[in-house]
């Protein structure tokens, strides 16, 4: 067994090492005597037996007695859990269990004795002691320990020898304790011990700290294991939880292993018994302060987020109210100050952003968030936003983290996506609750107030030059970029509907006041009582269901009454409004019908309108007015060309421009920002100058500036804006904007450079068909024009005047057209398939009049033209060498005669064999002759889909020397002409119906002459040959 990977013996009756340790893990409690008798060991009993017995017993008899006594004592261990009440755990064996590699495996396999042993409070207390050991809490990083260990091994080689002796002594002790095993096990054990001694020479000795770290890790794995008995035993002893939570009282920084153990154990307990665990957590004093001491510890803060996520709208737990009462949000904002370290500031900012994401206002019922709550409402309150802005103005990491928080707040709390819009609610119909969506009115107002401070910070920030391979450049810097990003996001926020409603701010304030009055009545004691009630209801589901049913019934009755009242109150007025609005629409339509332009409107952008909007500005307009007064948008626009290589900045500037040009024009202050962008900033001139500067730079260095992509996008926004106002027939009272858009240099740029760039952007990658026309395309176009021209205008077509032209210039595109027309005679749109068969053929675009769908009114004319075209092609083919009786009689090569139909420029002719005799031989001729094979054979090709092969007859037993001859109108007509010798029977004016009659007659003649043709060895048979497709030529 020494060379086998299987480490267990073949005898399945042998116990595992864990089971052997557990045999001595229980001590029976003797109620009559004060002494406790261990059940798993019999050392004291053996000593008494040796004193009372004679010294003449043999050693073998003593061993047998010891074995029998051990087996009897093992059998005395209880088999049920209730019987273990008379036993206490032997804590001396706990270290041996933790050192065993199979402990966790035995635990997950539900080892009965192991579960009973680990459930004892004393054992659990010892495991928690391992996790909360001061050496674990104070341990240094592994990187600082490893050099000391290696250095100690090199300086003190005696440690290795001592370790070897210790292992030998352990091996001898292990051998004495396992005397009952067989000899083979002894041999394998000796070999393994020798191997372990040899390998231990190269390994450093395990220090005491490493042993304790390993045992702490195993103890944490046991306490966090998915084993119900252990978790339930911990929850029944609150003192154990209190000792575990003492980790939070340790001064920062807390080692990552200790915090990881804490998080794993508590998450398991929280999932197992959420009510009991929350009751314990909320009963802790200064919960927020203890967590914020370790705010830069990700494991602890993640666990706090998980605790917060348990407080959902449909099942509140009171966690949010407790955290608000302990001022979680103000204390987190304090940690953003520069007086804290950069890591602490970033950790606090990341926690706030994660909490905002968790509190997303989403109408999706499947969302895992908790929705808006009092903590996020406190975060966007006037006091907290003012505090955050003052911290951000200090610059550095504080500004960066603050901008990230503001962006997350705006993106996750867009009032336009609220399930119920605030402006359509009343205090009676929708009473305010602590779960109402939050509004960003205070946020926008305060940033509008402090906009000059951010503008000064943007202008005053200067950084030293940075060396680059193409020269020295000034870096943008993190602060300036974050300010630009903040302005773009605030501009997004100012366009929300709620912030541009006249009564929006007033409605929000009324609801905030009413909500504050209701929340003042609640206290922390009531919250804890609610948690206890939830715990009791957890075990009494019937009562809960009954109460919920009664409450739902009452709510339904109340809702029905309130809805009826609302209908009674608002029904008449809504009907009146609808009638008035309909009347206005009708009146507008009448005016439009009488000649009045519906979209002929004038935009009021005069100074009087500007002053009127400034007197009583809405919340959204207040921010736009601040942006205009500080000229911060123009400063950001000037940075576009100052930092030509910063694409992050260019993307932000394009975002700002896109919002301005797509913003409202008839209402609000956005029209004046648009005027500033086009008139004051002279945006069109900046774009043209930037493009010219890039061209000059490219001539000098061969490089293009990095802003060219976003420059084109901004120019496209201006172009789309001009198209919009032209289409809607909008005009400005102040013609400055229109004048900027009508300037000659901008028109020239739009019609030349911008149009060319747009065309390049819209071109499919690798599609050069429109730019480069091959010679083959030229030949095909000229040939198709000649043929169609002859077909339409030459009355002598087919009489031999143009035979030479057709035989030499017949291109593959028209051949495709010809074959597709005949093969798809039963389909509805023959010409569509024919034209589409060759994408490169420009007849598809130039000769659209040949399609039936395009000229339904002239259907008869198009049909006759098709028939005339088919007849003329047929006569032309009769005059050439597709099938010639003279060639057949002379035994000439039908391949060479058949290929004369195709242009030599496109299709290589077949090389002639060196031996002339091979020309007359069929190289595909089978060695056996098959008789009785004809058109009447019922052979079915299993791979035939009915379209891939063109075969009217049997394809496998005919010679494939001739080109494919599909059974179509043309070739049936040709076959009839060849067999009957009547070359002049097909007239130019034959219709399609007449052709069908000829086809039927030619089919009968083909079947009668088939045997004769096969005997003559001609090539009128049909080969296994693919029909022509658009790739054939």
From Swiss-Prot:
Quote the biased-composition stretches of kind Basic and acidic residues, using this chain's numbering. 158-170, 183-195, 858-879
**Does the keyword field hold Endoplasmic reticulum?**
no
Entry keywords, A to Z = Cell cycle, Cytoplasm, Phosphoprotein
Q: Does the keyword Phosphoprotein apply?
A: yes
Q: Which domain of life is it from?
A: Eukaryota
Record region (Disordered): 32-82, 147-213, 768-1033
Q: Where in the cell is it found?
A: Cytoplasm
A single GO BP: regulation of signal transduction
What InterPro entries does the entry give? SAPS
Q: Where is the composition biased (Acidic residues)?
A: 171-182, 784-793, 825-838, 932-944, 1000-1018
Q: Which residues carry this modification: Phosphoserine?
A: 774, 857, 862, 892, 991
Q: What does this protein do?
A: Positive regulator of protein phosphatase SIT4. Involved in the general amino acid control (GAAC) response regulated by TOR. Involved in the dephosphorylation of the elongator complex subunit IKI3.
What protein does this entry describe?
Answer: SIT4-associating protein SAP190
What is the species of this protein? Saccharomyces cerevisiae (strain ATCC 204508 / S288c)
